[in-house]
Amino acid sequence: MVPPDGYDVAKPDQSTNDYSLFVKRAGDLFTVVLIYVDDILITGDNDSDIASLKTALHTKFTIKDLGLARYFLGIELHRNEQGTFLNQRKFILDILTDAGLTRAKPCSTPLPQHLKLSLTEGEPLDHPEAYRKIVGRLLYLTMTRPDISYAVQHLSQFLSAPKLPHMQAVTHVLKYLKGSISAGLFYPMQSQLKLTAFSDADWASCLMSRRSLTGYCIFLGHALVSWKTKKQSTVSRSSAEAEYRSMAATTSELLWLSYLLQDLSVPVTLFCDNKAAQQIAANPCFHERTKHLDIDCHFTREKIQDGFLQTAYIPSKLQLADLMTKPLSHDSHLQLSSKLGLTVFPT
């Protein structure tokens, strides 16, 4: 799509930017256009510019103005004087209806705390496509439900040959969603313009490959804007190495977000609960325990030296990214979910 007059996409050398995002700045005012195929979301603090843009678009092709955004790409938007609430209640209800679980007894966590699944144990499913479909829909649901990110990542490992225990675990996730169907993310109206990240790793947690899990969550002020659970690509020889690799992945995401927030000039803080990994990031010297690490892992160290990033230690019990790397008890899961901004919109 050719951008309307005055709207600039990211520069070609900034390959990490989002090319579906168009921004127009006029002094202290700005207008933002986000495009996904034929769905367009417009926001900003200049009403006249927004009106002019819609008129300009309408001269090029037929558009349907749906007014104030209440539903976008399956995400429901609700507002009050405190902020904006995002959830996917209707999407969850559709999943539960298709699975025949609308009257199921709810579970208190996405997965049992000590669940162990393998590729080989259990009877193969007669209809594995049903498992794949549900997991795919759950993956889309993680856009507003970071509390199921670990569960979805874990269950995604068995898509090629799912077995009965895997389907039972998926059913457990759906029963959890049944009990929290109205939950979503709240974005407060007033929030400090500062990026803060929490990075965590679960060392050698994959029983099949002994690879570690990376988990992170990133806040803009008090608003959660990015999160991920992902298995690391190589086997780490220590918990410090696993944590350091997680810090590198988190730093990459922070850098991408900083490109989107080009006016952001304050230091970025990355919280880690492993002091050894934090010391590796701060120490410019190689030694026996770190010389085997890939060069790209030292990306974090470079960004610290550049002044882009500062790291800080946080006790494990306060590590918000813990939710992204392992199944937790009900109390811990509820506490961390709340701190991530997961709540039920007040009616």
Label for each model-derived stretch:
Residues M1, L21, D38-I40, L53, ...:
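Mobile genetic element proteins and their domesticated derivatives, centered on retroelements
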Residues M1-Q14, R25-A26, R103-S118, R211-K228:
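Reverse-transcriptase-like RNA-dependent polymerase core
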Residues Y71, K194, S212, L224, ...:
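RNase H-like nuclease module associated with reverse transcription
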Residues R137, L195-L207:
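Two-metal-ion RNase H-like nuclease active-site motif
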